[in-house]
């Protein structure tokens, strides 16, 4: 009798088609931290970029329009990154991926907003970098060193935020294609 019980426990039921395989789950789980890390990087880099540029704008009395543009884009990018970070954390906490449990409209909106934020950040950073180069803020003799170092730091962090936003755009584009093919 004990042998028959051992034999019956050897043969388990076949895997259910409704339970995801371990390979599929492993493919999903690496994407959860990736999008959260990218959103954290977006928020931190854009926060540093716009706060340094806002301080710089205050020092030059707001006379340079491209600095105002960079601050405005930095604020918008930071707010958007914070909103997306909170949603991504909510998805991770509830156990869903960013591509499941949300509507296709959300996928489209996220992809479009990520793309727009990416383009606006690169344009703002480029405008400020060009202004610094053309206006001679950073002279070859080292004049304006404090202003030069702060503006260079702000542009550097804006470019780092751009890289984080562009990587996030690739990942949200992947989620969007996956959502479209699923439908």
Swiss-Prot record:
Residue intervals on the Extracellular side: 55-72, 140-156
Topology Cytoplasmic: residue spans: 1-33, 94-118, 178-183
Coiled-coil ranges from the UniProt annotation: none
Glycosylation sites: 141
Cell compartment(s), UniProt: Cell membrane
Superkingdom of the source species: Eukaryota
Keywords: Cell membrane, Glycoprotein, Membrane, Transmembrane, Transmembrane helix
CC annotations in GO: plasma membrane
Membrane topology: Multi-pass membrane protein
Listed Pfam families: CASP_dom (PF04535)
Record carries keyword Phosphoprotein: no
Residues spanning the membrane: 34-54, 73-93, 119-139, 157-177
InterPro entries: CASP_dom (IPR006702)
Subunit structure: Homodimer and heterodimers.
UniProt similarity note: Belongs to the Casparian strip membrane proteins (CASP) family.
Name the UniProt record assigns to this protein: CASP-like protein UU1
Organism taxonomic ancestry: Eukaryota, Viridiplantae, Streptophyta, Embryophyta, Tracheophyta
